[in-house]
Amino acid sequence: MRLLLVIFGLVTFLSAQTVEIVADKFYADEKKQISEFTGHVTVTKGKDKLVADKVVIIFDKKRQPLKYTATGNAKIDMTMNDKVYFGSAQTMIYNPLKDQYILIKNAFLYEKITDKKVYGEKIFVSQKTGRYEVESDGKKPVKFIFKVEEKKKK
């Protein structure tokens, strides 16, 4: 049976929205300030939704999240800077204080409205600065796919 968990103190990615986490299993260690969710994990915050096999959250002393790490078939639908994205990777890390995402191993990021696609071994995205960085593993190159509208000559 799936365990529905709404974490009371688990608010803000800077915007004071409630985070809801659904998983098969939940583990917390208050001394280490860590929570671990395993099995069919779904994290929802506003319109953003993350699914993965496992999500680990590290908290500060005020019980605010410092870092989210999603592993195992991690997929995310999110809005960043008024753009809608889908991302997938073996591991995803989100730093809410810096508004930074890191997608690691078989990383893919798709901007839905403009149909831009980025593939790489590691994708770094900063919401605050609008900076994107993509790295390869040396075996496969980074790939960026986008459409160009050709203007017709009269």
Predicted regions and their residues:
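Mature-chain termini and adjacent capping regions
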Residues: 1-154
